[in-house]
């Protein structure tokens, strides 16, 4: 099984990097300790999709300790091609129905490990996406952002970014609201 790479360009396995200053061992060790004390029983291994939603895998604490902490996890490249209704869209060079929806490796960025206040006994770790040779998936939103930050820094700029949170409150049921949906894609119209 492939070893996880942390905080690219570091290529050391998780258990073989005590001197690398780019690895936040304290966060990884704190997460392992919290799982051992049953303070965390679920770990969300996630990456942002093209709409900024968290995609990934929910794993149990014991499975995280036995496998994920050392090897990371895999997810289907399909997740980078879907619209808001989770319908795969055509025209992607990375992956498609014609090329196949291969898996990519989700390499944990341990600097992002944190407990979630809104989910009891749950931690979250943001991952970088890699192909089967350990190369970054250039079309992944997090990789695109990292490249833009590098470009800005090369020009002497320090990017400062904020996000906007939007939501809707509706006075109807899911069924009546669904009938009124205008989809973002003709492929995902309600039936």
Go through the PLM ranges and name each one.
Residues 2-191:
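Glycine-rich, acidic/polar active-site loops that bind/position phosphate-bearing ligands
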